[in-house]
Design a protein with these regions (language model features):
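Membrane-interface soluble catalytic domains
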Residues: 1-275
Length: 275
């Protein structure tokens, strides 16, 4: 993430002069803009073609525009929602490596989330309680290399929604009345691995919806009582982007979405603007 202090941090990086007015929090969370450039030497990347014009043509266009009548305010009954262009753009590799895992304690009737940042840049995570949207969401700043944990008291059901940078998304739905599957998400290069465990006394079935980015799936997995299964999802064809929703009995749901960072340059969200 970049903000107004990112320009100052870029100048610090370039000239070695430290700006004392940039807070420690902004240094942890906001980048210094160096990732927006490619400093590889030699750099043989072709420069993008820009539309050319002349000073005379630009002045002529400005003069014609100044003679136009003001654009009338459109009627509220005729206004349309702007359309988002559905086009992926080149995207630099990002420094984020975020992990969020859940653990249900039936005896204490709590749901705990473990938040971990194994990347090189701090990040802010927002956690919304879908069953109590009137409550202020909990917000956490995770420094690079740090981890923390927090818990929610659950009466019967829970529904938490975690949001982070660059489309990072985790959803946790379930109930306390019965033991339900548990999910652990790990990654290796261009693959995402889901490990599903079943702490219950009976076999459990988990359905995984089709991934809209790669069109893989759907799948149905059977987990024996006290056992676990693993499912691997290649993400290279989608530039690292993934969106997987898992369902089981009793309203159990987990959703994991975002972009898998490998240190390589990729593309922006290819499904941006689509419902």
């Amino acid at each position: 993430m970049f903000d107004h202090t990112s320009v100052l941090q870029f100048l610090e990086k370039r000239f070695g002069v430290r700006e004392p007015n940039v807070s420690a929090w902004r240094r942890a969370v906001c980048g210094d803009l160096t990732s927006a450039f490619n400093f590889v030497d030699p750099n043989h990347e072709p420069l993008p073609t820009l539309q050319t014009t002349t000073r005379q043509a630009a002045d002529s266009l400005r003069q014609r525009q100044e003679k136009l009548l003001p654009v009338p305010v459109p009627s509220t009954s005729k206004q349309l929602v702007p359309q988002q262009k559905r086009l992926a753009r080149p995207s630099r590799a990002l420094p984020y490596r975020l992990h969020v895992d859940s653990q249900v304690d039936h005896k204490a009737r709590t749901l705990s989330l473990s938040l971990q940042n194994t990347g090189t840049q701090g990040a802010v995570l927002h956690v919304y309680d879908g069953l109590h949207l009137g409550d202020i969401p909990r917000r956490y700043t995770l420094e690079a290399g740090k981890a923390l944990q927090d818990s929610w008291t659950v009466v019967e059901r829970y529904q938490l929604w975690v949001l982070g940078p660059n489309g990072f998304h985790r959803s946790f739905h379930g109930q306390m009345q019965q033991r339900q599957p548990e999910l652990l998400v790990t990654s290796s290069q261009h693959q995402l691995q889901l490990t599903l465990s079943n702490p219950g006394g009976q076999a459990a079935t988990v359905s995984i919806d089709r991934c809209p980015y790669t069109q893989q799936g759907p799948w149905t997995l059977s987990i024996p009582a006290g056992g676990e299964v693993r499912q691997v999802f290649p993400c290279e064809s989608s530039g690292g982007w993934y969106d997987l929703t898992l369902h089981s009995d009793g309203g159990w749901l987990r959703r994991v979405a975002g972009r898998l960072e490998t240190g390589e340059h990729s593309i922006s969200d290819p499904l941006m603007g689509r419902p």
